[in-house]
């Protein structure tokens, strides 16, 4: 991590190094862009007495961001941090990706999900309704396959910014066959799902 502490680096105040074991290719960076992270070449991890950084800093960018004249924010990751998170599920990678999304969208997120476990969320829009797919990735097979058992997680609190003409007062849970009551305020629908075993689909109309 280089330069001043940016909002994207929130939560990493106690360190200047993040783990990485993926692919990264050198590239030329525009003069107006900011480089928040640079690559540290690999070094031995065993035996312990040799585990130290031979080259603690390079000019190889790992995370680049820019703000255009119209206010649009752009983040480019030469380092495949997203693929590393999908593969190894390291919390540091997940937190960094979360910060990147929040900064790029200026904290104007269309959905906020909170609760235990690892939940994959996909929000879709169709005429007259919004559909949220929730997949529970928390399992006994987190580090190996095949999946041994479902581990239900919950409660899951969900807050969705409603599209025009969507009331969002009574979300329908297609998998569990329930219809629940949501709290609708200032264009947001907030509700809670008690438990998700493997998959749930929420429909807002």
Predicted regions and their residues:
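A conserved amphipathic helix/loop scaffold
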Residues: 1-205
